[in-house]
Amino acid sequence: MNKTAKALIDFLYKSSILESGVTSKKKKTRQNTQNRKERKEKMEKVKKQAKIWLCIGIALMLLASIVVSAVQTSGGKVTMKELAFETDSGYTMSAYLFIPDTATAENPAPAIVVSHGYLNNKEMTDANYVELSRRGYVVLSIDQPDHGDSDVIENFVTFMPDGVYQAVLAVSRMPFVDTSRIGITGHSMGSWSCNAAINADNLNENRLISAVLIHCNDPIYTDNDGNFTNAYGGRDVGVVSAQYDEFFHGYVDDNGVTRQAPYYMEGKNAQSFLYFGQDPTGLEARQAHTYYTETIDGEEAIHVIFRPAIIHPWSHFSARSASYIIDFFEHAFGAPNPIAPTNQVWQWKEAFNCVGLVGLVLFICSFGTLMVFTPTFECLRAKEVVQPAKVTDRKGKLWFWLSLAAGALFGSVSYLTLVSWGNKMSVSQTEAMGLGLWSTGCGLFAILSMVVFYQCYGKKHGMDLAELGVKMPAKKLGLSVLLGVIIAVMAYVCVFTADYFFYADFRIWTLALKAFEAPMLKYLPYGLLFITFYVASSVATNCFNYNEIGGKSWVNTIIVALFTTIPALIIPWIQYIHYYSTGSMMWANNLATGVNLPMYVLWLFPIVLILFFSTVINRILYKVTKNPYIAGVVNAIIVALLTITNTCTTVV
């Protein structure tokens, strides 16, 4: 082969390689361009969907507020007002006043004061105030002192709060109230307040209270010497006694055996009450759900005990209990607008309170998503929608399941101990302290488990903490905290708007996001006890447990959320399965030590939903930001506010 031919072959060969290289480079460039375009389109789709969900969330909150307002005002037939009045005891009390159109100075109506229980507020009595006001009664639903929007006072006594009596004095001065027909009722601590009101009213020559319904508490059985008595005189008296009440209706029988609420009707206390204060020894046993009458001071009085087969906190969320309350006051006073006790509408209010809560969760997720598309916070947005990590080896899967199980186990075994410690401390809010200590403990355990996971497995398998969002520059972290605060503030703007225009809040049973007075903000430092857990939970949920285990992304989210809620599920399950099957609680109230274990178990009911949906919020915001701290801050602030505004605050 001559030199010319060889040179030609070399030229053609090199040209083909060069052309191939150029072609490959062009293909790669085109592929990268296509990938960027697809990522951008996916992010635009996320933005578009977030706008839609934001509108849906706002619409749900608005719809919920309108329906709630319509139900609690009986479609405009009842005027609802929020009052803040100075009591004769010198503190300011907050209350809702319901005035039916039929109640006037010319035609005064019977009035009923209703009270919530310990750690609750006036909004929790909605079944009572909705149903009683639609039947024509004037209703005053109060915030007890140290609760809700009422003043925090120095001499508050849990066993003898005077809120009910102060409310009785207030309604007795209203021109549209028939002062010969004033009734009182309260759930749990609210019934202690009712008994205190009876004692105060007994000192008056002209008594104001004509009827009292004790709800999930004990009536007065004995005098100061321990002898059976009828402290209520000629008043009509009823008792709603939950068959599985965790706190009341217990007694010691003749054999020295401590009996709990399931055996209440067999004891002397219940029988003495139904015999109007007589010693029931040797008398025929009287029955629940039967009205017994006796003439006292020339007037016929009634005593009755109702026994719904429910637990203590369910009674203020129960159609059966509501029907008993309606029926009792119908017997005592006669309703101005008689409606069958089973004809109830308060459930619609509660249902739409829950719709509003769903709308608020949608608002938080969608508003937070849209904020990272703004110029100020766009640096927090991920380059693409975050995808779950691949876990291909058996060890990785084992670490996933073991870490989730370990967290659930620690949360379960530590709960009662840590909450008890917090509740014994001399602080203004023992509930917030107890739950905060538990949250901190669980948060520290989560951090420890993540460190162990990273050192033993993640680091060896190329886990990049900066890439996952665990590590980030201080400026970006500060911006993340700021955005979290803004989202939480805007969520509460929605809550306050619903309260201002509609007297509505967003709740389901004992979980409630409600408006509050400015002084409550000084208790926000309790939030520092919650931040460790909710930030650590977000980091664990997204940076360590967001993977393909479970198949689809949403399945993985559900798995992680369910494991997070296990402590709040398993403890009540054990408590109530044991209670229903044996008639005694696994964790009973210890009066000697002051450790109220049944109360601590009840605190877990709203936490089930809090833990589940906070995990969902974590995941949704992480997928668009690759940043676990935004959602952690949002959840910590909201849970802290939810806790400090739905409890008892004392002076220490």
Q: What are the residue ranges of the model-derived segments?
A:
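Short, positively charged and aromatic/hydrophobic N-terminal segments
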Residues: 10-17, 25-26, 31-34
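An N-terminal hydrophobic leader/cap segment in hydrolases
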Residues: 46-86, 94-96
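Alpha-helical transmembrane segments of integral membrane proteins
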Residues: 398-652
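Juxtamembrane/start-of-transmembrane alpha-helix segments at the extracytoplasmic/lumenal side
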Residues: 343-357
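Soluble extramembrane regions of membrane proteins in the secretory/endomembrane system
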Residues: 75-345
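Acidic, Ala/Val/Gly-enriched low-complexity intrinsically disordered segments
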Residues: 5-10, 19-22, 38-41
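Short, Lys/Arg-rich N-terminal segment immediately upstream of the first membrane anchor
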Residues: 41-50, 347, 388-395, 471
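Juxtamembrane interface at the cytosolic side of transmembrane helices
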Residues: 360-403
